[in-house]
């Protein structure tokens, strides 16, 4: 879809700071290997940049 990004949680947020866990929850991710589609806006891009060690942008 145009204007959407697919985000995959490929590492568990266990043993990460609470702030990072809240970012994962804010993106709507709950399980490892779960993929969600979100609008390609600066808000969601910024959330992905905060925790690149946990997330992957899937094309």
UniProtKB/Swiss-Prot annotation:
InterPro entries in alphabetical order: Ribo_uL30_ferredoxin-like_sf (IPR036919), Ribosomal_uL30_bac-type (IPR005996), Ribosomal_uL30_ferredoxin-like (IPR016082)
Per its UniProt entry, which superkingdom is the organism in? Bacteria
Q: Specify whether Ribosomal protein is a keyword of the entry.
A: yes
Q: What is an annotated GO biological process for this record, any one?
A: translation
Name the UniProt key words of this record, in alphabetical order: Ribonucleoprotein, Ribosomal protein
An example of a Gene Ontology cellular component annotation for this protein is: cytosolic large ribosomal subunit
Tell me which stretches of the chain form a coiled coil: none
Which GO molecular-function terms appear in the entry? structural constituent of ribosome
Report the Pfam families cross-referenced here: Ribosomal_L30
Please give the subunit comment from the record: Part of the 50S ribosomal subunit.
Record HAMAP family: Ribosomal_uL30_B (MF_01371_B)
| Annotated NCBIfam families | rpmD_bact (TIGR01308)
Q: Which PANTHER family match?
A: LARGE RIBOSOMAL SUBUNIT PROTEIN UL30M, MITOCHONDRIAL RIBOSOMAL PROTEIN L30
**Protein family (similarity comment):** Belongs to the universal ribosomal protein uL30 family.
Q: What is this protein called?
A: Large ribosomal subunit protein uL30
